Amino acid sequence: CLNEGGNVVNIAIELNGQPPLQVYVKPCREYKIILRSIDLGAMEVVTTYGEVRDFMQVGSPFSIPKAALVLAGFQPGFSTESYVSLEEQLKAFGSGMEITLLSAIPAGSGLGTSSILASTVLGAISDFCGLNWDKNEICNRTLILEQLLTTGGGWQDQYGGVLRGVKLL
């Protein structure tokens, strides 16, 4: 599309009356980040900036939420404030956090799942942290997230999941 131009017709759908990708963020008493994937049955506890920065680990079920945390400022160089440790930053924030993912669409389905999941994670973190990102900002940050992951995702996939209804992109 970049070289030749073009458009994509896209429709956002629900599966069994629910969004096919869901992300929940809630406070955690301990000053750490707990990552969970319901559909994969996986969990990881993140306590250091190094563990957040480890988003490029091949095969990790938590690459997307870790990269989203980086873009939300939970990494030196991505925050306007300076903290000695992730624990110190979470203390200043007021709590740790637990991020839970649920995907009813298999990875590699060709339905833009990773882009839409990235947007969903970024939106949930924005809401939880009071970052006030609008839908356009979330979609733009999704492009950056995919570049951080070097996945080279599509340029429009996230808009399909973030914006309701039928769209010509």
Where are these regions (language model features)?
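Active-site signature of alpha/beta-hydrolase-fold catalytic machinery across serine-
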Residues: 120
